[in-house]
Amino acid sequence: MLPTAVLLFVLHFVAADIPSYIKVCQRNDPQVDKCIMNSVDLLRPKMIEGIPELNVPGIEPLSLGQIALARGPQGAKLTAVVNDVKVRGPSNFIIEELKSDLDKNRFDFKLLLPKLDFAGKYKMDIQVLLLRLQGRGNITGTFRDYACNVTMRGHKEKIGEDEYLQFDPFKVKLRVGQSSIYLTNLFDGDPVLGPATNRVINENSQVFLQEISPVLEKSLADLFTEMANKITSKFTYKELFP
């Protein structure tokens, strides 16, 4: 009983003061969507490096998991693996539209990601009949004008006498814009195959984007969910939406 009482006291104490970088929105505000959008923009500078006092991770750079690509039949096959990918630019998102339903704790955002720069390590293997070409090195690139739909669904959890908002895993869907990709040291720096392969990759960049988009969507969804729940777990529902 005593540990529970201590925990409730600590939670109440932590939730006592909302910091100035979190803008509180009134539930009955006829422009509550605009208020929430302004609140997100106010919080943006803190998103970049994180909020240590709330145990919120930073959004820059965004780390992606392994990306694997395999295309073609056995006699003309391309396989590639990309690791250690870091993405910069997610914090520069633009909120184009928000529809909220506070009674259902649902928020639907339409975002624009103007520019995402990424860098990582790649390993590539190409088999064309009896010819086998291999390479490994650095991969860099830029994605521009990515449209992003984010769906947030939450529920209230009661702790002691207070209610807190917790979100289910976010749903993130990206729509591809423009892209450019560059691989270094292709085929041990071959002066002919290297540039030619980079041209082919960029001419067929949709193939690569089909593989990276689900990984990017999941990474963004996991990060946004964690950030939101870290914040809402520190303040009661009534404090955030009086």
Placement of each model-derived feature along the sequence:
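Noncatalytic linker/hinge segments flanking ATPase motor cores
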Residues: T151-E163, P191-L193, I212-V215, T225, ...
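Short, charged/polar low-complexity linear motifs in solvent-exposed/disordered segments
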Residues: I126-Q127, T184, E226-A228
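Hydrophobic-cavity lipid-handling domains and compact docking modules
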Residues: D17-G177
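Sec/Tat-exported extracytoplasmic proteins
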Residues: V40-M47, I51, N55, I201-S205, ...
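C-terminal helix/juxtamembrane-tail motif
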Residues: A15-K23, D222-P242
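Extended amphipathic ligand-handling, pore-lining, and cofactor/metal-binding catalytic surfaces
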Residues: E163-E217
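Cleavable N-terminal signal peptides of Sec/SRP-targeted secreted and luminal proteins
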Residues: M1-D17
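Residue-level signal for alpha-helical context at structural boundaries
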Residues: P61, G65, R136, V215, ...
